[in-house]
């Protein structure tokens, strides 16, 4: 399956987010508000009002981290981020099997991401289940961990049995919309960076970086 798991946020950043997002005057609303017609029938969670000042402040921190992360930039080739929101799934809640919308109001959704904010031992259940062609994979990461996966996959959030699941979700529009082409570019970039770290610059490596840049120029939008 074509996905990336990665530790994105450090403890200081996590604590800052939690401090801002646990203020008493924060307004949480029914998650169905932002779901498509089909997904709304199976969505049962809470989300922070995206128009609130606290949401905009925290969203800015998240999006800045994503767009400046070297590994994420290599994997996702992010052009822009759409629809970032903070969600809570309480005891008895879940988000059933669904597919994300192809387009948000601000553009195409190529990749979906979830950032886990509370430690996984603070709640039971609540795993993110992603369905590939021949397999199903469950994810429940440590606090600050991010998973990025193609928005073309069916997925769900399993029922929370105790505690609460607290995450950030959003969507990435990539410069390269093809899953396969992004994978080729990611492998080429990773291999070139590894060679550079081990052996330093060389004429041969310059040719590899040249090929990568020109492929990205050809495939990108």
Curated annotation (Swiss-Prot):
<protein>
    <recommendedName>
        <fullName>PKHD-type hydroxylase P9215_13741</fullName>
        <ecNumber>1.14.11.-</ecNumber>
    </recommendedName>
</protein>
<dbReference type="GO" id="GO:0006879">
    <property type="term" value="P:intracellular iron ion homeostasis"/>
</dbReference>
<dbReference type="Pfam" id="PF18331">
    <property type="entry name" value="PKHD_C"/>
</dbReference>
<feature type="binding site">
    <location>
        <position position="165"/>
    </location>
    <ligand>
        <name>2-oxoglutarate</name>
    </ligand>
</feature>
<keyword id="KW-0847">Vitamin C</keyword>
<keyword id="KW-0479">Metal-binding</keyword>
<feature type="binding site">
    <location>
        <position position="98"/>
    </location>
    <ligand>
        <name>Fe cation</name>
    </ligand>
</feature>
<dbReference type="InterPro" id="IPR005123">
    <property type="entry name" value="Oxoglu/Fe-dep_dioxygenase_dom"/>
</dbReference>
<feature type="binding site">
    <location>
        <position position="155"/>
    </location>
    <ligand>
        <name>Fe cation</name>
    </ligand>
</feature>
<dbReference type="InterPro" id="IPR006620">
    <property type="entry name" value="Pro_4_hyd_alph"/>
</dbReference>
<dbReference type="Pfam" id="PF13640">
    <property type="entry name" value="2OG-FeII_Oxy_3"/>
</dbReference>
<keyword id="KW-0560">Oxidoreductase</keyword>
<feature type="binding site">
    <location>
        <position position="100"/>
    </location>
    <ligand>
        <name>Fe cation</name>
    </ligand>
</feature>
<dbReference type="InterPro" id="IPR044862">
    <property type="entry name" value="Pro_4_hyd_alph_FE2OG_OXY"/>
</dbReference>
<dbReference type="GO" id="GO:0006974">
    <property type="term" value="P:DNA damage response"/>
</dbReference>
<dbReference type="GO" id="GO:0031418">
    <property type="term" value="F:L-ascorbic acid binding"/>
</dbReference>
<dbReference type="InterPro" id="IPR023550">
    <property type="entry name" value="PKHD_hydroxylase"/>
</dbReference>
<feature type="domain" description="Fe2OG dioxygenase">
    <location>
        <begin position="80"/>
        <end position="174"/>
    </location>
</feature>
<keyword id="KW-0223">Dioxygenase</keyword>
<dbReference type="GO" id="GO:0005506">
    <property type="term" value="F:iron ion binding"/>
</dbReference>
<dbReference type="GO" id="GO:0016706">
    <property type="term" value="F:2-oxoglutarate-dependent dioxygenase activity"/>
</dbReference>
<dbReference type="InterPro" id="IPR041097">
    <property type="entry name" value="PKHD_C"/>
</dbReference>
<keyword id="KW-0408">Iron</keyword>
């Amino acid at each position: 399956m074509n996905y990336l798991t990665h530790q994105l946020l450090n403890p200081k950043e996590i604590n800052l987010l939690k401090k801002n997002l646990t203020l008493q005057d924060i307004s949480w609303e029914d998650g169905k508000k932002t779901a498509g017609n089909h997904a709304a029938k199976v969505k049962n969670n809470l989300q922070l009002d995206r128009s609130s000042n606290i949401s905009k402040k925290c969203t800015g921190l998240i999006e800045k981290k994503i767009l400046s992360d070297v590994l994420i930039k290599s994997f996702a080739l992010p052009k822009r981020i759409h629809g970032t929101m903070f969600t809570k799934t309480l005891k008895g809640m879940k988000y059933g099997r669904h597919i994300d919308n192809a387009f948000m109001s601000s553009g195409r959704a190529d990749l979906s991401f979830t950032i886990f904010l509370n430690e996984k031992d603070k709640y039971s259940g609540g795993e993110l289940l992603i369905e590939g062609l021949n397999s199903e994979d469950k994810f429940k990461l440590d606090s600050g961990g991010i998973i990025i996966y193609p928005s073309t996959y069916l997925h769900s959030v399993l029922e929370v049995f105790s505690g609460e699941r607290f995450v950030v979700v959003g969507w990435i529009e990539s410069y390269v919309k093809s899953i396969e082409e992004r994978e080729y570019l990611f492998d080429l970039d990773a291999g070139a960076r590894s060679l550079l770290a081990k052996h330093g610059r060389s004429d041969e490596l310059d040719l590899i970086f040249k090929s990568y840049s020109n492929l990205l120029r050809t495939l990108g939008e």
